[in-house]
A protein has these predicted regions:
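Solvent-exposed loop/turn segments at secondary-structure junctions
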Residues: 28-32, 50-55
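Redox-cofactor binding/interface segments in oxidoreductases and associated redox assembly factors
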Residues: 25
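Glycine-centered small-residue hotspots that permit tight backbone geometry or close packing
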Residues: 10-11, 31-34
Length: 136
């Protein structure tokens, strides 16, 4: 595990050296090495799956959330309403399946940026912005 962490930190440093301002990992708990590297090297990171902001609040700006509570609610509701098909279901912003949070971060995100983020989220929900998916 230590060797893997070292290679991941090396990758993060390489990405940072190439000019990235913010590094987003997509590996859940295995992103811990990236957060440690963010603290050691002073770059900004983003968490994923759950709110990871409190892990390193001075270095994690935001977290992308997979809202499993909402997913479970949708699944249970479909079973109760006898509409469950057993097929894969994709939940996104409009269904409450995913979201983003800055809660717990000490990095100040301006109200202007938060408003832009909300506007973009609404455009995704309305279909004005199409998010590609390998599942469809």
């Amino acid at each position: 595990a230590y060797e893997i962490r070292l290679s991941l930190v090396g990758s993060e440093m390489c990405i940072r050296d190439m000019g990235a301002d913010v590094i987003f990992h997509a590996a859940g708990a295995s992103g811990m090495g990236m957060f440690q590297a963010a603290e050691e090297k002073g770059f900004v990171a983003m968490g994923v799956n759950l709110n990871q902001n409190s892990i390193a609040p001075d270095y994690i700006m935001a977290s992308m959330l997979k809202k499993l509570d909402s997913c479970a609610y949708h699944a249970i509701t479909s079973i109760v309403e006898d509409t469950y098909t057993g097929e894969n279901q994709m939940l996104g912003l409009s269904d409450g399946g995913v979201d983003v949070t800055v809660e717990g971060s000490n990095i100040k995100v301006s109200d202007d940026i938060l408003a832009q983020l909300d506007e973009l989220k609404q455009k995704v929900i309305s279909g004005e912005i199409q998010v590609p998916s390998e599942l469809n």
